[in-house]
Amino acid sequence: MSGAMARNKGASFERKVANMLTEATGKVWRRRVRNAVGDSDVVADDPAFARISIECKHANTLCLPAWWRQAQQQAGEQGVPVLIYRQTGARGESVMVDAHDVNPKIFPVRGRHTVTLGWEAAMQWMREMLPVKVTYSPGII
């Protein structure tokens, strides 16, 4: 596949993922149009999801170790790396996350193990476990 076709395929998948995340979480997600090095592919408008760093991949051949390293680098020390991928011809999206972010009591070391979830299970995890409670009172200093 040529470079332009691959970029279009990637951009199309990122838009699809943003729409699916919006539907699944009830929050607006959007594709980041001009990615700089270290930026995630898809971001939420809601600050409660600010730590989530999403990397999207749609490819004929899966390169999970390399993609996971990219997701980890983009997330940095404070972020939560999430790799959403689909192999061409496969049914549905898969979501890879750090096992520590799923259950820190069982997996106390960040970055040592990953867990791959189906879309529905991943969205339940994202809705229930990930949002940071952002509390503020406008007008109060």
Model feature map: region roles:
Residues 1-141:
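Catalytic phosphate/metal-binding cores of nucleic-acid and nucleotide-processing enzymes, i.e., regions
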